[in-house]
Amino acid sequence: FFMKEVKIVDNFLTQEEFSNIWNYIQNMTWENQTSKGKKSIIDFLSSDVSKVEYFNHYLFEKVKDTLGINVKLSRAYFNGQWHGREGDLHTDGCDITSLIYLSQYRPEWGGFTQLFLDNDEEVIVSPHEGRMICFPGMCLHKGYSYAYQTCPMRISLAYKMFLC
């Protein structure tokens, strides 16, 4: 699949893993960020977990096993987007990006990830709770917030990786 398509893995997280992550989120600190390399006036939230063992070892090993290729971790972090806090179209500057969607999801909320692959194919992925997507880090992409002010924050866990 590498560099040619988007890999989608539904129900990537066990219920225990999901609970562990949500417990961590409840106590973490968020920082403001904008899409890589952009001078956007709209920011969204981020929290780096690259140095947290549960994320950089346990879950990262599960991501690697699912990919089936040897990769090294560049960065792991949470993205948080409230209604109206959109990212910009951007690339990640890594070989592979994985996103694990964590928030509740309803189809009418939107919140999809839009990706443009090398062959100009556009892929739209809905952020189903517990779903993981993997895609070439250099493909142009954007994460959209949920559509309504009454929706929860759209939270994903991002892994940026390089081939070994």
For every predicted segment, state its role.
Residues 1-70, 81:
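Non-heme Fe(II)/2-oxoglutarate
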Residues 57, 61-164:
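Catalytic core of non-heme Fe(II) oxygenases with the double-stranded beta-helix
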